[in-house]
């Protein structure tokens, strides 16, 4: 996902209740404003109901992207509780759940790979749990036992006054294992498309990530930069410094792959973040150009249109 000219785009939220005219209008608006890239979250809950797949709502979006020449980052988002799980789960709940996730990926990738506008698959929305220990499900226990068998005994915290970071190291490994599992399935189904992730809360979740391992199965690396969520250690005057810092961290850890700002706060937030913030046009432009000056191939705003439901409803829109 390398570009000769930095790209600017936005997340398009596709939701039940939108008409084909609504969706066409979103992509026409992108085209008319020089935005040639967009991101779509592929809600499994919108496509799989009553044991049947119905892709028609998202087909409208992909056809509109084809029509207006907009390239798409498609974020895999298996079925979850949409009302209470805004960002998506980080790990499967069980072996059976992993099989359901695989079935979702197989169905979605196999169907949407037909569209010319599809550019890259975002393997998981905002991986990283910020140090939260892995819940030992049947799947996690199986992976943990295999991993622990190869874990150097001298690094285990069994001695006197020796810090034990076994669980933290397993979190990093398990995150890599799960992302690689998704990447292998996606590559097998659609080898011509890119594979991408967008780490978030970078200053707090950085130990969760093993970027050298990711470089073996990703084609680009991104980040989520939201002033209302991720900039707690900065004053508002220092927000551009935060954008620069986090961009530098991701660019360095992309290890030669292209890096993007996959999500940048583009609109007002009063209730669905840690810090209410209503950026002006001048602020937004400063954050945009700071990211591009840091070497980003492109910036995708969160988001073009406001969501109609859940915690983010009525907020974030450009």
Model region roles, listed by residue range:
Residues 2-3, 26-34, 59-69, 108-116, ...:
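Acidic (Asp/Glu)-rich catalytic clusters
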Residues 6-18, 41-56, 85-102, 111, ...:
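The substrate-binding groove and active-site-proximal loops of carbohydrate-active enzymes
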Residues 32, 51-52, 75, 79-99, ...:
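Aromatic- and acidic-residue-enriched carbohydrate-binding clefts of CAZyme catalytic domains
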Residues 6-12, 36-40, 72-76, 119-123, ...:
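Hydrophobic faces of well-ordered beta-strands that scaffold small-molecule active sites
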Residues 23-109, 173-194, 287:
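Aromatic-lined substrate-binding rim segments of carbohydrate-active enzymes
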Residues 92, 111-245, 249:
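Polysaccharide-binding and catalytic clefts of secreted carbohydrate-active enzymes
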Residues 16-32, 100-109, 201-214, 279-290:
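Short, acidic/polar
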Residues 196-198, 204-318:
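Hydrophobic targeting/anchoring helices
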